[in-house]
Design a protein with these regions (language model features):
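N-terminal twin-arginine translocation
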Residues: 2-22
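Glycan-processing catalytic domains of CAZymes
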Residues: 16-344
Length: 344
């Protein structure tokens, strides 16, 4: 509009710029609040393939406030260490050649969880040997010491210490997986007087292509084979693993209902809780990894609700859903999520 016309109408250009307090909500043409709300998130501080945000306690405190605002009550440290990088000054792991961290992140997360009335799940140590060799014996051996050390140092000190995450990830009935999960799960429960444990495997679907340079694959697992293999796994671990949160990003959106129905049926059969790990990053992009398009997240959460899942957690809030993420799109996703779930 020409300046003379603006002046003639007695208007100032600033009137056309909305402040955040006056921002107009999106006019959704789908039903609102029709999915399973995210109530838990992983904390990806030992980053494997995502850039580190270099936050201090001030930034983490603010992020916990953002989490609390949308109803997150559970935070899960995805791993307490990966190869030589660790999250707390573990005497055992330092003795094995790991690097000394500058901050005790386990203590910080437990304090923040206590401050904001959340439960903290401790993720076990990842040696890296399993990814190199597919041999799980290293994970069992190292975590024998880590589990005891962590419980003695933090478990009895903080009421926010709410459970354990067995961080080894599988998708199929990998050799030795049942025994390894059972051993680690049992030790976690024994040492902590029965605190809950969970796993978060991936579904070996068409998007399970890490390391191949491709976007999809042809030899994806069928729903029937997935059911057979996970029936066997659950049969062997259900007495020491309380919940299973399948990652939801490796299958296509029109496959969600079929796989989710099977997952819930198996969990119910073995008395386990069925969670979804709703990935808030986008596997359909050639760039690893950026915040997901809102409609993709919406469809996944709606499928989880249709299947009757017990809880939705995400990987992960701080990079892909937080208003203070290094990715600008994450804050916009936070806004779209709040609009959809009618969170003020």
């Amino acid at each position: 509009m020409a300046p003379t016309l603006l002046a003639a109408e007695g208007k100032d250009r600033s009137e056309f710029v909305l402040s955040p307090s006056k921002r107009t909500d999106s006019k959704l043409i789908v039903p609102k609040n029709n999915g399973l709300k995210i109530t838990g998130t992983f904390l990806d501080e030992i980053s494997h393939d995502i850039p580190h945000q270099n936050w201090g306690e001030k930034e983490w405190d603010l992020d916990f406030q953002h989490m609390k605002r949308i109803g997150i009550d559970t935070v899960i440290m995805i791993r307490s260490g990966y190869r030589k990088f660790i999250t707390y000054p573990s005497k055992y792991l330092l003795g094995k050649g790991c690097y000394m961290p500058s901050v005790d992140l386990v203590d910080m997360y437990l304090r923040l969880a206590e401050k904001y009335n959340m439960k903290f799940y401790f993720g076990l140590y990842d040696t890296g040997h399993y990814w190199d060799t597919r041999d799980m014996s290293w994970e069992v051996e190292y975590n024998k010491y880590v589990i005891d050390e962590v419980w003695n140092t933090y478990g009895e000190k903080y009421k926010s210490f709410g459970g354990w995450y067995i961080s080894t990830e599988i998708s199929r009935n990998t050799k030795g997986a049942i025994g390894a999960f059972h051993t680690m799960g049992k030790q976690c429960k024994d040492v902590s007087n029965g605190l809950p444990t969970f796993i978060s495997p991936w579904i070996d679907g068409k998007k399970a292509v890490m390391g191949t340079g491709k976007m999809t694959r042809e030899d994806a697992v069928s729903v029937e084979q997935h059911e057979r293999e996970w029936n066997e796994i659950f049969d062997g671990i259900h007495d020491v693993v309380d919940a299973c949160a399948f990652q939801d990003g490796h299958i296509d959106y029109d496959e969600l209902d079929a796989f989710f129905t099977v997952n819930k049926k198996l969990a119910d059969k073995y008395g386990m809780q069925c969670w979804t790990n709703a990935e808030t990053f986008d596997r359909d992009m050639p760039i690893r990894f950026l915040p997901i398009k809102f409609d993709k997240l919406r469809m996944k959460l709606e499928a989880a609700k249709r299947a009757g899942y017990d809880k939705a957690i995400t990987f992960e809030f701080s990079h892909f859903l937080s208003p203070q993420s290094a990715y600008l799109q994450a804050g916009h996703l936070y806004d779209r999520y709040r609009e959809y779930f009618e969170i003020k």
